[in-house]
């Protein structure tokens, strides 16, 4: 779309420079560029205002003028008779190239005239090659008071236009009024409605035309008699030509100009070809051919919106009128129509029959429904200026325009989450009101009424974008927004820790083939998903994929596999599917010794140690960790268990069943653990990391051996002591567990080491002995019920 800068300036309370207009368009999100169709022989000549002048100290006929271009001041020596303060003139800067009366080029330089420095030259019209504008000999070219300062003179004098491209969400900018309104929102200028669009409203008469409300909820027209197809005034023709519109006749030119100015398409019919009593808008029931205004004959498919009467089709609704009933050279009575077509209806029509037109461009993006009648009234006033004797009927209207504005709630917390910056409700209200919205503060949000011309505002995120328009993109005080979710950060930190600790990270696919899934021998319901010809099942455990990868590595002469994987496993619970973020650790023994050193052996406790190291790394206390027996078919029946934290199942671990390892073609023992990272992430959210200083006083310890039944976990004794709340008991460590298989009693000896510590003083033997005896007494109560004894 093309808009002359001079025409756009009439909508602003104060002139804006071309740079300001371009910056405003960029801020709005409009692609804009300047197009100048007039060529001048000068360059580097700008507009400047004379602030003040003083007589030249060494020359009676010269004056020293101080000028401003809006940003910088310039001192120029000038001899023109009209060099006075307050004038806006043409200032040639050093480096500017001008031409003399003989056509010879010369360059303006910074120089001294009679001892006073001159930083350029104030130009007369003849010095710029604009002899027709020279009104007095040796006089300066005087520019209008509204001329913006610092602008290139060629841009100011030339036929300069703004060429813009609109995205589909900016339909409200597809007119002079709409674009000027948006520019005013992001600049300091106020919107001014030109005088030709300021008038009293005309009376309207309601009709029931039977229009399809799903296509055209509002339709209006006026009948004007006593007009002709005479040319429009020269000024209007020049305006249309600057807009790349071909002048046709007064009536058609007025409808086109109002569409470009206000954004409301109008159409003029020859009244003798329209049956007003049956005029309506509806969907075409059967395909018909129609010759359009552009002379093209098209076959209209059924379902497209049309304007018609009982006798003929009058046009393709919202797109283009038919040629036969259009305004003719012989027309003396016209029907001018203005309507509101729903954007979704016109978009559907354009898919069925894509015919580009200025009307379709605006209707598909959405026009202001409350501007339909005012645009028709503007056309009437324009016509009366050209045809004062014309007779005007009342404005007839059918349908209703929804006067209720859309309401959308905006919450400050949404802006904080998305932009990383907090706004009060009062500030949000001020910003949105400056953009033309009405606001009502609520307790925790702002209720925003959307103007009728803003079809792009439908939900909260749209208002967030509007707030972005009021903010600089270079917000230095903006709080950094975390880009990662807690579970993502946990997975990265865990992977880094395990890799640094010596494990290798494996990556296996989520989709497995049925043969690999069968390795786990689980009886869970499988989730099928066709990934390729062979991979059809989503994994319910990381074990099958890791077993297959481990076997591949061992078969390629890897001495052992010490690996981990972090991935998603899938489970089905009834009709619902659940995804769980999981960590798996897989360890295998070395196949053979490669040196004189003995082979490092692996056991169930090696695997448990890795889990405990991981928890310790994440600052989780292993005191809350309990190991319970399990009966999972994937593991060795006597070397497996379930780890629980606060009674929640957190991990399964053990030696992979030998038959399963053999089935996977692995000859050596395999140990496997699978941890629920989602549960671990929830625990970390509840964990408070506190600094614990190093002790500066020595600690003391006592060793204790207990005889307990073999089914009592040693860790139970340890936790019993730690949970008693002793103020000096620093730690309890299991030293050894011994069981004599030759004895008939099924007991075992558990040796514990109790460390006592005070961070404020050195404990005496008496303090330690008293606390030790108290803890032993507590254990005696526990062992009395289990027939255990304390040996030392």
Curated annotation (Swiss-Prot):
Which coenzyme or cofactor does it need?
Mg(2+)
**InterPro entries, per this entry?**
aa-tRNA-synth_II/BPL/LPL (IPR045864), B3/B4_tRNA-bd (IPR005146), DNA-bd_dom_put_sf (IPR009061), Fdx_antiC-bd (IPR005121), Fdx_antiC-bd_sf (IPR036690), NA-bd_OB-fold (IPR012340), Phe-tRNA-ligase_IIc_bsu (IPR045060), Phe-tRNA-ligase_IIc_bsu_bact (IPR004532)
List GO molecular-function terms, semicolon-separated.
ATP binding; magnesium ion binding; phenylalanine-tRNA ligase activity; tRNA binding
Q: How is the cofactor bound?
A: Binds 2 magnesium ions per tetramer.
The source's domain of life comes to Bacteria
Write out the GO cellular component annotations: phenylalanine-tRNA ligase complex
The reaction(s) catalysed by this protein are: tRNA(Phe) + L-phenylalanine + ATP = L-phenylalanyl-tRNA(Phe) + AMP + diphosphate + H(+)
Q: Where in the cell is it found?
A: Cytoplasm
Tell me how this protein assembles.
Tetramer of two alpha and two beta subunits.
**Cross-referenced NCBIfam families:** pheT_bact
Protein name in UniProt = Phenylalanine--tRNA ligase beta subunit
């Amino acid at each position: 779309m093309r808009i002359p800068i001079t025409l756009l300036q009439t909508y602003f309370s104060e002139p804006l420079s071309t740079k300001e207009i371009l910056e405003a368009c960029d801020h709005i999100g409009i692609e804009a560029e300047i197009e100048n169709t007039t060529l001048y022989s000068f360059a580097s000549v700008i507009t400047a205002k004379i602030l003040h002048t003083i007589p030249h100290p060494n020359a009676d006929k010269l004056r020293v003028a101080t000028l401003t271009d809006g940003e910088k001041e310039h001192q120029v020596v000038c001899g023109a008779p009209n060099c006075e303060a307050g004038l806006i003139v043409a200032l040639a800067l050093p480096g500017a190239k001008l031409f003399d009366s003989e056509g010879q080029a010369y360059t303006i330089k910074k120089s001294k005239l009679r001892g006073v420095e001159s930083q350029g030259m104030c130009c007369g019209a003849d010095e710029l090659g604009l002899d027709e504008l020279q009104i007095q000999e040796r006089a300066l070219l005087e520019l209008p008071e509204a001329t913006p300062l610092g602008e290139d003179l060629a841009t100011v004098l030339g036929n300069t236009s703004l060429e813009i491209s609109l995205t589909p969400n900016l339909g409200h900018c597809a007119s002079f009024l709409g674009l000027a309104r948006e520019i005013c929102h992001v600049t300091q200028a106020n919107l001014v409605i030109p005088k030709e669009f300021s008038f009293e409203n005309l009376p309207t008469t309601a009709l029931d035309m039977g229009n399809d409300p799903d296509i055209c909820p509002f339709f209006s027209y006026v009948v004007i008699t006593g007009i002709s197809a005479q040319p429009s005034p020269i000024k209007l023709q020049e305006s249309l030509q600057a807009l790349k519109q071909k002048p046709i006749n007064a009536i058609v030119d007025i409808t086109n100009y109002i569409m470009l100015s206000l954004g409301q398409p109008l159409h003029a019919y020859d009244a003798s070809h329209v049956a007003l009593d049956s005029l309506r808008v509806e969907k075409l029931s059967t395909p018909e051919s129609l010759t359009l205004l552009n002379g093209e004959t098209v076959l209209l498919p059924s379902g497209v919106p049309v304007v018609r009467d009982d006798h003929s089709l009058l046009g393709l609704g919202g797109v283009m009128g038919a040629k036969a009933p259009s305004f003719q050279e012989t027309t003396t009575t016209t029907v001018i129509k203005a309507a509101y077509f729903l954007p979704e209806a016109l978009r559907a029509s354009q898919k069925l029959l894509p015919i580009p037109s200025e009307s379709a461009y605006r209707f598909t993006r959405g026009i202001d429904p409350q501007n339909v009648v005012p645009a028709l009234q503007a056309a009437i006033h324009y016509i009366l200026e050209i045809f004062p004797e014309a007779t005007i009927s009342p404005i007839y209207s059918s349908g209703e325009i929804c006067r209720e504005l859309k309401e959308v709630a905006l919450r400050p917390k949404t802006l904080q989450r998305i932009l990383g910056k907090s706004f009060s409700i009062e500030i949000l209200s001020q910003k949105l009101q400056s953009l033309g919205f009405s606001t009502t503060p609520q307790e925790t949000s702002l209720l925003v009424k959307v103007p009728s011309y803003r079809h792009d505002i439908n939900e909260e995120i749209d208002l967030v974008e509007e707030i972005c328009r009021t903010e600089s993109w270079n917000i230095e005080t903006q709080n950094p927004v975390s880009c990662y979710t807690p579970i993502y950060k946990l997975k990265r930190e865990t992977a880094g820790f395990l890799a640094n600790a010596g494990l290798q990270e494996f990556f296996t696919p989520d989709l497995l083939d049925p043969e690999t899934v069968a390795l786990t021998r689980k009886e869970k319901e499988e989730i099928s998903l066709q990934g390729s010809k062979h991979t059809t099942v989503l994994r319910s455990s990381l074990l099958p994929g890791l077993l297959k990868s481990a076997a591949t590595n061992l078969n390629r002469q890897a001495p052992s596999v010490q690996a981990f994987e972090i991935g998603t496993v899938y489970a089905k619970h009834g009709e619902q599917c659940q995804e769980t973020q999981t960590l798996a650790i897989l360890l295998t023994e070395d196949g053979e010794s490669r040196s004189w050193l003995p082979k490092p052996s692996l056991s169930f406790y090696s695997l448990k140690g890795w889990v405990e190291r991981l928890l310790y790394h994440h600052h989780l206390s292993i005191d809350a960790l309990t190991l319970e027996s399990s009966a999972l078919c994937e593991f060795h029946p006597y070397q497996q268990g379930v780890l629980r934290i606060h009674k929640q199942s957190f991990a399964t671990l053990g030696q992979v069943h030998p038959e399963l390892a053999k089935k996977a073609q692995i000859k050596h023992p395999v140990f496997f653990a699978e941890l629920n990272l989602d549960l671990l992430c929830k625990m970390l959210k509840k964990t408070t990391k506190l600094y614990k200083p190093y002790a500066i006083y020595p600690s003391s310890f006592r060793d204790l051996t207990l005889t307990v039944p073999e089914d009592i976990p040693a860790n139970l004794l340890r936790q019993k002591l730690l949970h008693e709340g002793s103020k000096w008991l620093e730690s309890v460590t299991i030293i050894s567990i011994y069981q004599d298989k030759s004895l008939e009693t099924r007991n075992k000896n558990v040796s514990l080491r109790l460390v006592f510590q005070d961070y404020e003083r050195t404990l005496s033997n008496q303090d330690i002995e008293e606390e030790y005896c108290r803890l032993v007494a507590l254990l005696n109560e526990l062992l009395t019920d289990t027939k255990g004894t304390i040996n030392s």
